[in-house]
Amino acid sequence: MAIFGELGSLGHLFKKTQVLEILHEYLKDVMQKGSKANQRILNLATNTEFQVPLGHGMFSIEQSYCLEHAKESEKGFFESHKKYVDFQLIVKGVEGAKAVGINQAAIKNPYDEKRDLIVYEPVSEASFLRLDAGMLAIFFENDAHALRFYGESFEKYRAEPIFKAVVKAPKGLIKLKL
């Protein structure tokens, strides 16, 4: 199941391989105020994204959006991936995420290999995560996940833009051992 928490508290997960350490360095750089990566993301216009290659088959989709102006079709939907593990880091803003095991979700659109995407029907009983700046959510192939949500407790952030980095890492690079 998904892993989430403050980036600073999850550092031990990246110590297993040199490639994961490269990923961790990128994520820390993105959060470092004033760094080139941090400024690149914070300077994105609303509703834009920029892709950055990280090597070893990894890449980051740096993006900004504001949910207040999102069309219904742009709001969160449940998805999972077969080839990549998602590392979603909030750089600025507050966003809600939902997650549920893929066995508890009904497939709406079958696997699209080109997009590495399975889309699911909405799930009413899913875990809800509040992600603020510095929070990292890691979603694996068995996690149907949806972002771009707001909970009642932080509705006041709805009009503020969200700046984030979504790193796609080939699942073969991830050595998950507790």
Regions found by a protein language model. Give the residues of each.
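Conserved metal-binding segment of the jelly-roll/cupin
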Residues: 129-151
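A short secondary-structure junction signal
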Residues: 99-102, 148-152, 177-178
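A short hydrophobic beta-strand segment most commonly corresponding to one strand
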Residues: 136-138, 155-177
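A short, N-terminal "cap"/entry segment at the start of jelly-roll beta-barrel domains
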Residues: 1-62, 70, 77-78
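Conserved short histidine dyad/triad with adjacent acidic residue
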Residues: 60-81, 91-106
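Short, conserved beta-strand element in jelly-roll/cupin
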Residues: 82-96, 101-102, 110-121, 168-170
